[in-house]
Amino acid sequence: IGTTVPALAGEYFLVTGSGKYFRNVSIKPEDSICMIELDDKGENYRIVWGLVNGGRPTSELPSHLMNLEVKKLQDPDYRVVYHAHTTNIIALTFVLPLEDKVFTRELWEMATECPVVFPDGVGVVPWMVPGGREIAVATSELMKKYDLAIWAHHGTFAAGKDFDLTFGLMHTVEKSAEILVKMLSMQPNKRQTITPDDS
């Protein structure tokens, strides 16, 4: 699997296949996703169901597993890691400084629910080649502090206790990013905003 995750040894995971389209998951799940089981050391996997026409789990498997291990060691109720190519977040990585504090503040200002949904903020990983160990390590370091990490020019990783919370976190961050993108396209400077004293 490209990494070692002993805290996840022997566990099962449902993951998408590499190169598979998410829209096909509901149409042909047996060809688009798979259930994997990790060995007793957390170093290898075997496919126990799915990918019936061949294939491999997502190329981001090391990142998914390392992130989940970090979160589960903090709180055993964490069980979902979700990765998506969030369009507006990606756009912002081309114009905002790639700093946790800057992204957090800008996203918090766009919608009042943001400080409630992600009170610890968001982390930002600078551009790295996806699918490798380096980006997995960088992301898992951020997951020690945040539930959401942004990959510059690529997408977002979110972690949570169930699918609804995890998808909701990512959706809230992406919605806030969409508001910011629209605001920046109309006027680069805010005329009024939510200040830290207001929240």
Where are these regions (language model features)?
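Glycine-rich flexible loops
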Residues: 1-199
